[in-house]
Amino acid sequence: MSTVNLDIVTPNGSVYEKDDVELVVFQTTAGEMGVMSGHIPTVAALKTGHVKVNFRNGTEYIAVSGGFVEIRQHKVSVIVQTAETASEIDVERAKLARQRAQSHLEDQDNSDINRAKRALARAENRLRVAELK
């Protein structure tokens, strides 16, 4: 089976690269999308979610927050604000972040509800991906 090269990049540089990927699945703003070798060139906006990476020896999950994906025939580039593999996620830190975000959402005087909603979505996403180890 043909494979693609996957590169996940954050503002800090490349954080994940794999050459033998059979299938990459991610959540775009239009819905879930899967990519295999030979896919037509595409650019899509990503929402906070996970990237599922299938390769011959297994599957890995990477939590990502906002960005976009560029798909070429044999290369997928994911450009996001943050990215963590399931094994890199500090579950306790993610739980604390979720609690803080929930607290801010409950505070009716909080003027930055949208920021708290985004923080909550990121924390919950990290916890979901951490469970996929």
Swiss-Prot record:
Subcellular location: Cell membrane
CDD domains attached to this UniProt entry: F1-ATPase_delta
InterPro entries: ATP_F1_dsu/esu_C_sf, ATP_synth_F1_dsu/esu, ATP_synth_F1_dsu/esu_N, ATP_synth_F1_esu_C, ATPsynth_dsu/esu_N
Pfam families attached to this UniProt entry: ATP-synt_DE, ATP-synt_DE_N
Keywords: ATP synthesis, Cell membrane, CF(1), Hydrogen ion transport, Ion transport, Membrane, Transport
HAMAP family: ATP_synth_epsil_bac (MF_00530)
Protein name per UniProt: ATP synthase epsilon chain
Name of the gene this protein is made from: atpC
